[in-house]
């Protein structure tokens, strides 16, 4: 079977777990929402969660806004440091909406689980998946591909589950990234080859695949990276990362295809390195 080949030019230097819907502890959904509204911060409209401090008149402000204020935003009195134990007890019986409810998340949960859920919530804004820190774009999952097509036009896209990712000029000095897209099974995958400078000029390459999709969708796929040539073969197989979690942690933990300069030279041709990439459904 013939493989498509794309050339990736160096780009420069560098799930939300299926939360169980918790039944209302007391009363109806409407009454729970009424209770939750009592905890809204008057500044940012997020929720004031334990430990809860009030001003002398009993007004509440969330822990994020409180350090930025010099007086109570409601009564203009001193903020004070009075602990409101009664409201803390009420908070323990209220189910709070996720902060990304306006983006579509319907989960309500106790305040003790709220921060952990929001860290993994699939409705949290997605960051641009391109390596490096130059692009600060954030948006919904549906907007990621349009963003890449309009703002990162240099990235090549190949169709099919079996392609060749050709990284050019791998001998360039310093930290360098190579990126391309692969489209198959109705999804888009981003292939990344990253070169890092280590100690004493030692260089390491990290190759990984991430899905333009959620963590749950990523679990339906597997990818295989293969360096093949001169009667040698080096392979790596894994589940693609979702762009929701990114690739930084995987690279830091070497949870990807890792090889150094000497290995790269065994497979390179004229300073270019071809990586066979195969995507399959689980």
Curated annotation (Swiss-Prot):
Any single biological process term in GO: protein ubiquitination
Q: What induces it?
A: May be induced by p53/TP53, suggesting that it may be required to modulate p53/TP53 response. The relevance of such activity in vivo is however unclear and may not exist. Induced by ATF4 in response to the unfolded protein response (UPR).
Q: In which tissues is it expressed?
A: Widely expressed at low level in embryos and adults. Expressed at higher level in testis. Due to the high similarity between SIAH1A and SIAH1B, it is difficult to distinguish its own tissue specificity.
List residues binding Zn(2+) 1.
98, 105, 117, 121
Ranges that cross the membrane = none
Which residue stretches are annotated zinc finger (RING-type)?
A: 41-76
Modifications made to the protein after synthesis: Phosphorylated on Ser-19 by ATM and ATR. This phosphorylation disrupts SIAH1 interaction with HIPK2, and subsequent proteasomal degradation of HIPK2.
Sites of the modification Phosphoserine? 19
Gene Ontology annotations for the cellular component aspect, listed alphabetically: cytosol; nucleus; SCF ubiquitin ligase complex
- Composition bias of kind Polar residues appears in 1-17
Coiled coil where?
none
Zn finger spans (SIAH-type) = 93-153
Q: How does it assemble?
A: Homodimer. Component of some large E3 complex composed of UBE2D1, SIAH1, CACYBP/SIP, SKP1, APC and TBL1X. Interacts with UBE2I. Interacts with alpha-tubulin. Interacts with PEG10, which may inhibit its activity. Interacts with PEG3. Interacts with group 1 glutamate receptors GRM1 and GRM5. Interacts with DAB1, which may inhibit its activity. Interacts with UBE2E2. Interacts with SNCAIP. Interacts with KHDRBS3. Interacts with SNCAIP. Interacts with HIPK2; the interaction is promoted by DAZAP2 and results in SIAH1-mediated ubiquitination and subsequent proteasomal degradation of HIPK2.
- Its biological purpose: E3 ubiquitin-protein ligase that mediates ubiquitination and subsequent proteasomal degradation of target proteins. E3 ubiquitin ligases accept ubiquitin from an E2 ubiquitin-conjugating enzyme in the form of a thioester and then directly transfers the ubiquitin to targeted substrates. Mediates E3 ubiquitin ligase activity either through direct binding to substrates or by functioning as the essential RING domain subunit of larger E3 complexes.
Please identify the protein, giving its name as recorded.
E3 ubiquitin-protein ligase SIAH1A
């Amino acid at each position: 079977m013939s493989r498509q080949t794309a050339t990736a030019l160096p780009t420069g230097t560098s799930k939300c777990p299926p939360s169980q819907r918790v039944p209302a502890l007391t009363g109806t959904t409407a009454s729970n929402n009424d209770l939750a509204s009592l905890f809204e911060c008057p500044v940012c409209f997020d929720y004031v969660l334990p430990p809860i401090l009030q001003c002398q008149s009993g007004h509440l402000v969330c822990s994020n806004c409180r350090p930025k204020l010099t007086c109570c935003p409601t009564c203009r009195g001193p903020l004070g440091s009075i602990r409101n134990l009664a409201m803390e007890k009420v908070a323990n019986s209220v189910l709070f909406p996720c902060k990304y409810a306006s983006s579509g998340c319907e989960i309500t949960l106790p305040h003790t689980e709220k921060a952990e859920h929001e860290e993994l919530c699939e409705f949290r804004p997605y960051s641009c998946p391109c390596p490096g820190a130059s692009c600060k774009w954030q948006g919904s999952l549906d907007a990621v591909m349009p963003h890449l097509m309009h703002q990162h036009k240099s990235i090549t896209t190949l169709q099919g589950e079996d392609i060749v990712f050709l990284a050019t000029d791998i001998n360039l000095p310093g930290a360098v990234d190579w990126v391309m897209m692969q489209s198959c099974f109705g999804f888009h995958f981003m292939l990344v080859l990253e070169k890092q400078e280590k100690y004493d000029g030692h260089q390491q390459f990290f190759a990984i695949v991430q899905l333009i999709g959620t963590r749950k969708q990523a679990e339906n796929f597997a990818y295989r990276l293969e360096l093949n040539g001169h009667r040698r073969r080096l392979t790596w197989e894994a589940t693609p990362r979702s762009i929701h979690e990114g690739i930084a942690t995987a690279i830091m933990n070497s949870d990807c295809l890792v090889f150094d300069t000497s290995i790269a030279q065994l497979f390179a041709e004229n300073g270019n390195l071809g990586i066979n990439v195969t995507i399959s459904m689980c």
